[in-house]
Structures are given as structure tokens and as C-alpha cells.
Amino acid sequence: MKTTSNRRSFLKKIGVSGVTASVLPAAIISEEVNANPLADSRNNAFEKNRAKRDYNATYKDEFLNRVAFPIGGLGAGMFCLEGTGAISHMSIRSKPDVFNEPGLFGAISVKGVKNGAKIVEGIVPDWKRFGQPNTGNGAGGSIFGLPHFESAEFLARFPFATISLEEKDYPLQAEIKGWSPFIPTDADNSSLPSGALEYKFKNTGNQSVDCVFSFHGKNFMRPKEQDPDASKNGKNSIRPITNGFILSQAGSETRPHDQGDFAIYTDSADTVVDHCWFRGGWFDPLTMAWESIRKAETKKVDAVESGAPGASLYVPFNLKAGEEKVIKVMMTWYVPLSDIRHGGEAKEDEKCDGSSGCCATSAQMGTSIADENYTAGKYKPWYSNKFKDVTEAS
């Protein structure tokens, strides 16, 4: 009985407070909100720091939270290198996909050093850790909770973006330089479906160190939307390429535009490739990949027929005191079809003289066409008529 009475008393108080709040003048409510000293101090600190940063200067601290640098050929699709070094905005299917974080990341491990394994990125912004879907359950399957460098600075100078990373009492300084194919007056080579990340490591200690750099990726080429009948979907696989791997998705009869490949490879001849992460439940694949990073292993696993959840490449190296090492990670994609169509049925080909300024077709310009039999009537990216597949584009 006492419990019932207490509950009724609580509900009455809630009801009264709700009515009171509804009739309070807005000025009083505003005054109460603005009286929060912690909020005031944070706002003042932000305004003070914002006033200090010059236009187009280096980004650091809270200014890293929302900055992202697009990488990719003109009109060929793109991904973004964020201010912290994270890879996001993966948009390679002929349309923007700015909330697509594909699960690609670089890592470094220094042998014989306590806590020597790190994701080669700065600290994850608060809005990602607390505002993204599934973060209430710990963001399982993400790299948010893995060790990152404590300090990051970002500088954009098109077509390059440079991120400097440091950690107190850590023997290496790291730098990421991302860039797009861009050659003034060369439209074709500036429109290639590719981009690169150069990872540079410098030994700032006074002793030689043995390290393993690695780059990892979930097979994000599998479309988010597929036919409920799995037998009607194309095969999802990870294939080999020299010094790397290809994340691959085949098209199907009902969804030919699902076809796509994303190649990741390095310039290091001693690259070791794991073509198939551990296949388990929940986030076991990423957990096992992190174990290899933590132990500074170089794990070689051959490609499987289908269903590989992700892949990794490893580059071992040694740095003497003061030495530097640069490892280039190249990325090339090939998504030849789309489901995009605008306008009505095609009419008779317009007779066009390119020198007059009208838009001539590839055939009229004398350019070889990779697929002369394409008649689907949907948009095809320019590069798909120049290259037959991802290996030719790489």
C-alpha cells in the first residue's frame, strides 16, 4: 500500500512540474539553460580556439571533428580521408554515399614495445562514439575502441591532404598523405578511378625498432540492399592481386549493377596478404584481425571461393634511430554499371563535330570502347569504357 502511495505522489509531482514548466516564461527557461557554467566554459573555449585558427591553416583539436578530404578521379567516384585519418564517404557506385564508412584502416605495431600496436589515426570524435547507430551497445565491429594516436593535425593542399600523428612515449611519428590522380591539362588521367594513401613512419627514439605496418578492410562491396532470396544475388569474394587484394561483388540477373571491385595494394615487394579473415559470429573477424596486429604478426592466408568477411596486408620493416619509411597504399575501383537513368528513350544519334564544341561520343572521338555491346540504357561511368576490369585500371 505504501508503494502505491509513493508512486501516486511521484506522479503528482511530475504532473505539477510539467504544468509549471509549460507556463513559465521562455526568458526564465532560457536563463536557467544559460546559467550552466560548464556549457559556458566549453562554448567560450571553442570560440577562443576558433578565433585563433587562420583560414586554410592546419586543423587540430575540435576542428578535426567534421573535416574530410575527397580522394578520387574527377567524375569517377571517391572516398574521403578525414582529419583524424579515418576513411569514410565511400561513394564509388555513381552516386553520393556520404555516411558510408567502409571499415578500411591502417595499423602499425612496434615489436617489443608495451602497447606498441595502434590504429594509424587520431582520436575518434565524440559524435561518432556517442551519436552513431549501435554506439549505445559499444559500436561492435568498429575500430572506435582500439588504440589510436593521441595527437593529430590535418593540412589540406589540393590534391594532397597530410595528417601528422604523434603519441607521447611512443618510438614512432606517423604521417598520412592522401592524394588523387590530378594532372593539369590531362583530363583522362585526372579522371581515373583511383587514389592513394602514403604512410610515413619515423623512428624518433635512439634504438633500432622492428615494425609491421598493415592495412585492413571489410568486404564493403557487398550491397546494403540485396534480393531476399540469396540464390538470386551475385557472389561476394576477395581475390588476389600483386601485393594486395581485391574486394569483389558479382552482379546478378536482377541486379547487374551490384557488380564491382575495389583493389588495395602496396608498392612493397615483401607484402604478405591475408585474403580471408576468420569467419565467425558477431565481430569475431575484426577481433582476430586485431590480435594479429597486436602480436605484430604477418599472416598469410590464401583466397577462398566466397564469403570472406575481410582481408589484410602486412609489410614488415626495420628502422634505425632517425630513419624513415614510406609505404604507399594504392586503391583502384571498378563499378562498370549503375541503376541510374535520367530522361526518356534515346533518339537517333546526333551528328556531332567535336571541334564545334558539342559533346561527341567516345566512338566519334576514336576512343576504344571496352564493352561495345552494352545496351542496358543506364548510366555507365566514363572509365568503364576505357578499362575492361579493375586489374587493367590499376
Predicted regions span which residues?
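Residue-level recognition of alpha-helix boundary/capping or hinge positions
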Residues: 5, 11, 113, 123, ...
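An extended acidic
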Residues: 85, 96-169, 251-293
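Secretory targeting signals
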Residues: 1-6, 32
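Acidic/polar, glycine-enriched structural segments that form the non-catalytic walls/loops
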Residues: 34-53, 58-59, 162, 167-171, ...
